[in-house]
């Protein structure tokens, strides 16, 4: 998972030392959400992890709303790059 995190940060960073911009945070959360989606297909009764999963989805939604409000160009390009619905 840490290797994937580094590659995601490298793909979505805004500047050379970027690790915490909204774009990077959304990309990292999306990667973790996709991983957990596959996990829940294998283990449908893992309810404890599902709580954290739903929190991650809510956090990503808040970050997407923030990005949409303050930087629409970045929001639209990020949605396309991550294949998310609007």
From Swiss-Prot:
The keyword Ribonucleoprotein applies. Part of the 30S ribosomal subunit. Forms a bridge to the 50S subunit in the 70S ribosome, contacting the 23S rRNA. Belongs to the universal ribosomal protein uS15 family. This is Small ribosomal subunit protein uS15. Pfam families: Ribosomal_S15. The keyword Cytoplasm does not apply. InterPro entries: Ribosomal_uS15 (IPR000589), Ribosomal_uS15_bac-type (IPR005290), uS15_NS1_RNA-bd_sf (IPR009068). It comes from Endomicrobium trichonymphae. One of its GO terms (biological process) is translation. NCBIfam families: S15_bact. SUPFAM superfamilies: S15/NS1 RNA-binding domain. One of the primary rRNA binding proteins, it binds directly to 16S rRNA where it helps nucleate assembly of the platform of the 30S subunit by binding and bridging several RNA helices of the 16S rRNA. Forms an intersubunit bridge (bridge B4) with the 23S rRNA of the 50S subunit in the ribosome. CDD domains: Ribosomal_S15p_S13e (cd00353). PROSITE patterns: RIBOSOMAL_S15 (PS00362). One of its GO terms (molecular function) is rRNA binding. SMART domains: Ribosomal_S15. Keywords: Ribonucleoprotein, Ribosomal protein, RNA-binding, rRNA-binding. One of its GO terms (cellular component) is cytosolic small ribosomal subunit.
């Amino acid at each position: 998972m840490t290797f994937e995190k580094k590659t995601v940060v490298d793909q979505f960073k805004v500047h050379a030392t970027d690790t915490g911009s909204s774009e990077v945070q959304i990309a990292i959360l999306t990667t973790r959400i996709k991983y957990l989606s596959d996990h829940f297909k294998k283990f449908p009764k893992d309810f404890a992890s599902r709580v954290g999963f739903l929190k991650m989805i809510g956090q990503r939604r808040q970050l997407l709303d923030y990005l949409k409000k303050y930087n629409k160009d970045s929001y639209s390009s990020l949605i396309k790059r991550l294949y998310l619905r609007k």
